[in-house]
């Protein structure tokens, strides 16, 4: 870039501000537009699909530029934030009428994907998180902040594997890492990763900043005083939040210490495969949350999503939630609460915007309505006798003084912004009322003045008017201008008319225009004072919002329990997982036919089920429904089963389906083996493991060998395992592994068509039905027929499977009839020998053939 002195004064001002924010788009306010210059303009024009032009010159070069109207800002910001961009808003703060040189400007806010708070820029049903990381490959400190709610947490995590799984769960839109970290670390590959100066993570500075923020002497009260890495990360987050918001952050009131040991851990693959709140296509339809979320408020939907993605192992918390749901189901109490909860709205985010001092008039109107609904809701909550619900009721206040203040202050349907006034009610402030009266009565004054002047001058064509450039005026046609009285002072000459002003009109103009600007300034001052009053009550209001969000989630789970026919699971000390008539909560909602419920039993005598059966027979559904039932139990919800008895699990693993990881350079089989390795390294005797078609991505022998060894290892680990396979050889595992049992999904053929019955029955499947499924999928008949021929040849040429002696017992499971993948086909030498026509061979030919056969051995 050229020297700053080479630029025009305005562009010098621009570059002084832009140089402080080199990596962010700068929106530079000029009159009624935000202008964007130079490389920012080229980038913004492409991203926003707006016209790129050029204006004038500075430092001898034309200036690339584009612009947007100031009143359209939010729509463009929303698009940029969704694309992961950050924007610096630079406003005019000086008065153009009195400025000498460029109007004074300054940066008033910085919008980044992780620090936005504007309602229009957020997904109301999803947390908007920003995270920071500090540490090395052995131990990491992770801090996470939701600036739109004030939730602020820290934890320390061992190793990249656990860290990446936690980042997958949290899915922060921005991730801050130290600039002195090596390049291309796994964390930096995440979208939104940004490097920050190493001193932003300084642990001593962070500790002081956090203590100052929370007005405490130390961090012991938050249980994280010794988490030095996490404290450094939290300090970086706090600095970044203050830097972007340009204001104090009173809604950040505490720091929560999270522990992985308190939760049921799900890795990224398991989270995706179970489709908790995002389906495999990236949408939200047909996910677990889409079925069980009927929350009345957006803040409750976000809380439910956090519960689903972070199941708990705290039995006291889970049983308290179960008791609460039972209480809400009693006499259908939830039906009375839910309409009242709907009136509360998303006050969690409204309160955060109040804390950030950027709450809009409609935020205050919604808060007013919510506070007005609290007394009736509080009365209904006092009838709830469950201890946890009683605690929530005790936390929830009614705030009659604040409700009255907002009722007196805010009009029923306020405008979107305070900028143009019209937000505060008449009678709220006498001085404002007087100023507004002067401004609003201007129209009547002009009518009266015009009538008086017509009568005084006798000029019937006289008009009194106003425009923004010249102010108030009296207009006469050019032919009558010479008849104007002596006190008329010429103001403007037009084609066919002359405009004048009188001392009386000038005095009114000064008063009226002054009154309008003074009224806007007065209303803005009163509005800011109203925000400060609300900020002084922020702590109890935020506590009430959190309690109401939880009440909404519990009421929702009660409603779902009733309408989806869910039952309360029972936690026991004995290691087990017993489900009667379990169902898949999502699949049963989309089926047009009744869902076939199935039982499951795992305990100290059986820890693994080998599941066989045809494709489309229901193996994957059976496995997934088991995981979802266990997960729902661990958030305190009722579950889709006639009954469920289980012990606490520590992890849920799934190895179900795979696709190439093209970006990471990994094949389908490599992805499958990576997931399998993770399970074999980390599963315990308290883990639930789902393994579907392990080994299918490689050659038959390799795949079967790997599947067999993996199943043996899981049986030795005593993990609760559902192992679905088409390798029927694995059905002999119960002979060598006493904790393993066979089950199958049944099907039958009728008129050469397969019928899936979806019942889970003991023992292995009788056959694969692969050709029948292929026919059902529309594979051409000729191909199916040719496949039958190949199958017949393979089955007749394979050697019979050698069964262990134990398998010959009468009660042993019958191994299905299928070619043994470990049996050899006839040796090529034997095949060739069998085809020889010895009587037609000469002695020389016979000797040559003997050599050929020897070479085949």
UniProtKB/Swiss-Prot annotation:
Pfam families: MutS_I (PF01624), MutS_II (PF05188), MutS_III (PF05192), MutS_IV (PF05190), MutS_V (PF00488)
Any GO MF annotation of the entry: mismatched DNA binding
Membership in a protein family: Belongs to the DNA mismatch repair MutS family.
Job description of the protein: This protein is involved in the repair of mismatches in DNA. It is possible that it carries out the mismatch recognition step. This protein has a weak ATPase activity.
Protein name (database record): DNA mismatch repair protein MutS
Positions of region (Disordered): 797-820
Cellular component per GO, a single term: cytosol
Organism of origin: Pseudomonas putida (strain ATCC 700007 / DSM 6899 / JCM 31910 / BCRC 17059 / LMG 24140 / F1)
Keywords: ATP-binding, DNA damage, DNA repair, DNA-binding, Nucleotide-binding
Calcium keyword on record: no
GO BP term (any one): mismatch repair
Taxonomic lineage from the root: Bacteria, Pseudomonadati, Pseudomonadota, Gammaproteobacteria, Pseudomonadales
CDD domains, A to Z: ABC_MutS1 (cd03284)
HAMAP family (UniProt xref): MutS (MF_00096)
């Amino acid at each position: 870039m050229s020297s700053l002195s080479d630029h025009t004064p305005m562009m010098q001002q621009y570059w002084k501000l832009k140089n402080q924010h080199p990596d962010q788009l700068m929106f530079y306010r000029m009159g009624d537009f935000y202008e964007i210059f130079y490389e920012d303009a080229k980038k913004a024009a492409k991203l926003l699909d707006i016209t790129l032009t050029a204006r004038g010159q500075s430092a001898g070069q034309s200036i690339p530029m584009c612009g947007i109207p100031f009143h359209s800002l939010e729509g463009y910001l929303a698009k940029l934030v969704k694309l992961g961009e950050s924007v610096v808003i630079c406003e005019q703060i000086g008065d153009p009428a009195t400025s000498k040189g460029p109007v004074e400007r300054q940066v008033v806010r910085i919008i980044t994907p992780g620090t936005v708070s504007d309602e229009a820029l957020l997904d109301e049903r999803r947390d908007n998180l920003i995270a920071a990381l500090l540490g090395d490959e052995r131990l990491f400190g992770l801090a996470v902040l939701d600036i739109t709610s004030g939730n602020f947490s820290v934890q320390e995590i061992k190793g990249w594997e656990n860290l990446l799984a936690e980042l997958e769960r949290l899915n922060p839109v921005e991730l801050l890492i130290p600039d002195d970290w090596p390049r291309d670390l796994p964390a930096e590959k995440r979208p939104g990763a940004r490097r920050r100066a190493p001193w932003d993570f300084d642990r001593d500075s962070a500790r002081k900043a956090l203590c100052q923020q929370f007005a405490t002497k130390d961090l012991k009260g938050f249980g994280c005083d010794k988490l030095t890495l996490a404290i450094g990360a939290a300090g970086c987050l706090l600095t970044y939040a203050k830097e972007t918001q340009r204001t104090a952050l009173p809604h950040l009131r505490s720091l929560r210490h999270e522990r992985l040991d308190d939760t049921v851990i799900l890795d990224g693959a398991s989270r995706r495969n179970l489709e908790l709140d995002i389906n495999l296509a990236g949408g939200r339809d047909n996910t677990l949350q889409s079925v069980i979320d009927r929350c009345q408020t957006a803040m409750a939907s976000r809380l439910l999503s956090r519960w689903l993605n972070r199941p708990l192992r705290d039995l006291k918390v889970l049983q308290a939630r179960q008791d609460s749901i039972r209480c809400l189901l009693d006499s259908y109490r939830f039906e009375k609460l839910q309409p009242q909860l709907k009136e509360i709205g998303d006050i969690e985010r409204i309160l955060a915007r109040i804390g950030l001092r950027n709450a809009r008039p409609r935020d205050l109107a919604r808060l007013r309505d919510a506070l007005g609904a609290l007394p009736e809701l509080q009365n209904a909550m006092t009838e709830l006798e469950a201890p946890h619900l009683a605690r929530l009721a005790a936390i929830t206040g009614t705030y009659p003084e604040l409700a009255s203040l907002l009722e007196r202050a805010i009009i029923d349907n306020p405008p979107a912004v305070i900028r143009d006034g019209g937000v505060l009610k008449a009678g709220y402030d006498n001085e404002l009322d007087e100023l507004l009266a002067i401004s609003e009565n201007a129209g009547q004054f002009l009518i009266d003045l015009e009538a008086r002047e017509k009568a005084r001058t006798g000029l019937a064509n006289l008009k009194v008017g106003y425009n923004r450039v010249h102010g108030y005026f009296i207009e006469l046609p050019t032919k009558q201008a010479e008849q104007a009285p002596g006190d008329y002072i010429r103001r403007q000459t037009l084609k066919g008319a002359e405009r004048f002003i009188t001392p009386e009109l000038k005095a009114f103009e000064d008063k009226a225009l002054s009154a309008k600007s003074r009224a806007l300034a007065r209303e803005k001052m009163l509005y800011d004072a109203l925000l400060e009053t609300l900020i002084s009550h922020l702590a109890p209001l935020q506590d009430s919002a959190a309690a109401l969000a939880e009440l909404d989630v519990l009421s929702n789970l009660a409603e779902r329990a009733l309408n989806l026919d869910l039952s309360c699971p029972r936690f026991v000390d004995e290691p087990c997982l017993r489900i009667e008539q379990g169902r898949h909560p999502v699949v049963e909602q989309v089926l047009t036919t009744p869902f076939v419920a199935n039982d499951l039993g795992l305990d100290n005598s059986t820890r693994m089920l080998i599941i066989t059966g045809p494709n489309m027979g229901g193996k994957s559904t059976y496995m997934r429904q088991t995981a979802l039932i266990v997960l729902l139990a661990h958030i305190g919800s009722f579950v889709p089963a006639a009954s469920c008895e289980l012990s606490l699990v520590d992890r849920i693993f799934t190895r179900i389906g795979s696709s190439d990881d093209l970006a990471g350079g990994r094949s389908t089989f490599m992805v499958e083996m990576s997931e399998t390795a993770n399970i074999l390294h980390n599963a315990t005797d308290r883990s639930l493991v789902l393994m579907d078609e392990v080994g299918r991505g490689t050659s038959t022998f390799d795949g079967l060998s790997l599947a067999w060894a993996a199943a043996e290892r899981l049986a030795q680990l005593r993990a609760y395992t559902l192992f679905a396979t088409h390798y029927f050889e694995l059905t002999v595992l119960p002979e060598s592994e006493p904790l393993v049992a066979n089950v199958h999904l049944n099907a039958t053929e009728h008129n050469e068509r397969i019928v899936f019955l979806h019942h889970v029955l003991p023992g292995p499947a009788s056959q694969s039905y692969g050709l029948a499924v292929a026919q059902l999928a529309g594979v051409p008949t000729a191909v199916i027929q040719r496949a039958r021929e190949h199958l017949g040849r393979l089955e007749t040429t394979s050697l019979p499977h050698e069964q262990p002696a134990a398998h010959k017992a009468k009660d042993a499971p019958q191994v299905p009839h299928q070619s043994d993948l470990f049996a050899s086909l006839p040796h090529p030498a034997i095949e060739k020998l069998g085809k020889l026509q010895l009587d037609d061979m000469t002695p020389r030919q016979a000797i040559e053939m003997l050599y050929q056969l020897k070479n085949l051995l």
